[in-house]
Amino acid sequence: MSIAEICNKMYGKTIRECSNEQVYTALLALVKKVTEERKEAQERQEKENGKKVYYISAEFLIGKLLSNNLINLGLYEQVSQELEKNGKNIVQIEEAEPEPSLGNGGLGRLAACFLDSIATLNLNGDGIGINYHLGLFRQVFAQNKQTEHPDYWIQKESWLTKTEVQYPVQFGKLSVMSRMYDIDVTGYEGRVNKLHLFDIDTVDEKIPMHDGIDFDKNAIEKNLTLFLYPDDSDRAGQLLRIYQQYFMVSNAAQLILSECRRKCEKAGKALKNLNEFAVIQINDTHPTMVIPELIRILTTQKDIDGSLMTMQEAAEVVTKTCAYTNHTILAEALETWPLDYLEEVVPQLVPIIRYLDENVRARYTDSSVYIIDENDRVHMAHIDIHYGFSVNGVAKLHTEILMQEELKSFYRIYPEKFNNKTNGITFRRWLLHCNQALAAYIEELIGADFKKEAGELSQLIKYADDENVIARMLEIKAENKKRLAAYMQEKCGVKINPQSVFDIQVKRLHEYKRQQMNALYVIYKYFEIKAGNIPDTPVTVIFGAKAAKAYTIAKDIIHLILCLGELIANDPDVSPYLKVVMVENYNVTMAEKLIPACDISEQISLASKEASGTGNMKFMLNGALTLGTFDGANVEIAQLVGKDNIYTFGASSDEVIAHYKNADYCAKDLYENDEMIKKCVDFIVSDELKQYGDEENLSRLHHEIISKDWFMTLLDFKEYIKVKEQALADYKDRAAWGRKMLINTAMAGFFSSDRTIRQYNTDIWKL
């Protein structure tokens, strides 16, 4: 059925007569129909008893799906042309689509890329998560501060399909009935898998107060699936997080066991063979309770042969089935929960967790590997490592640090469990969709194979000295910058100069990612311009980031950036040469506009703190040059492109780890003994800035940088300035810069999530 037929059937109108919203709904129906047909064909060919991966994650930052699905189904060109013939534009149609608010940062975006690659590689694998009604929050700036509002994204017509699947979930004093919603995951010329999102029918979207995100955290039946990462700065918030996590894994366990029970019966096997039919990938520690929950079910419900497993047997079965991905080196992000909180929310799991801990204590004397510590806190990662068969980091450096530092006690016990799987991104969304001009030009140069085999991009290297190719790549970049400038003017009311250098830092706001260092550079540059040192090319510094509601210093950093933006915009001496923009409510849709237009990609986390990063890969693929520390996947980018095609600076991870061990880093010494550093830091509390900001916020941040600076901003600041100035100077030689751009795109193939998923499958899942 064509779009015209669907429009006629649904609205009794031609495409031309329909509104953009109506055409979007028609396209939604078209895509759902095509995916349904593909699923039916797939099911006819498929072995019902095949092994399947279940990817459990608290976040899936999937982005808008219309164009992505059309590209993956091979319909994008055909649909675009049909719309164009009828006076419609697919980009404008896509504006009618709300972005699902099911994730926040890199963790959720990685999960989305992985689902895309699992389907593209024709692997049998589904995602499992929660159907958050209001997401993290919608960010609005008011008086140069972040404010948080509910993000109502679920519409009557959406990619969500309500199913009849329901499971009972029992908490301590409460039981709820879940409801499963599905989103189809289309692979590029591949299969269709599913993202299963669990919800409750009693959730109440009206309970947030005053258009903010404060609500009664105790009304579990009304709030359970409202928000991603509800504020956990108080006891009620922490309990709600435990409710959410158990809700997710209880549903996951029931779904997995029901599917595997059917497969076992067909194969004449019992659930003690679970690992032959399922592999469960635990994405960070949020889904950890799936391990004790599976053990609970396996020891309380009879197996197919009528037997009941012992605790030991069930633990062995689960250990052979579960694999854990670690995403962090930050101690604060390795989740621990007070045992008495678990006793309140999930009392049925506590005896199992105690049993698992006793097992560990019987085998090992090192208390650092115990599950329950001396303060009666339960270490979720410890459960994953002891009772899973694989533990992977997400970049070479990250995995090394886990094995040698953070998790070395575990590595000594289980060296065979540890492995690295460097993260990747889906090139369908992050090149074919968001940078269509560049993708088309690459196809013109090297053919279409790179769309399925990203390593083919390396063929571009043969054009590194071809002036015409370099000129065209620079031209595409300039077009993308103009497009971004027009979009920012239209959507945000912000005017930016497309002739300026676009220097972009977009990621979750956290002190270790060091947006504060970039802000201090802006202050340095402001002083330089005021002193008459005018840059050859104007610079536009673009930030995009949300700060967790209760993360005070992160919100102070946003306040500083917004104040600097206003100060500079109002200064006629500086504004022609320097612009600071912070995009509101940064999300996947905004990333798709920013990344193709970027010149300098800011990846400036403190070395040893960023597990991998994936923004760095997206920018690299689209021809931005990385300005970064030797952290996460930056290390692998540097190895691939060579030192002449990346701008690196800063203390090494070994040096940083040594500073922490020796407790010998003192920000105050650097501040007091370096005039330039002192001048930049003190500007945070200057009268000039205070006229645009709040003295309390600015003073608190100023004090934090001088007295704590836990992530060593001042340690790397001067070298950061030096290397950034070098990058800006190099930008003037357009041909040389264009060559560096081409080399970055050519070497990006390694960072395809298809490569990552092939490695997961070869080494861990074995589907």
Question: What is the meaning of each model-derived region?
Answer:
Residues M1-L767:
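A conserved ligand/cofactor-binding region detector
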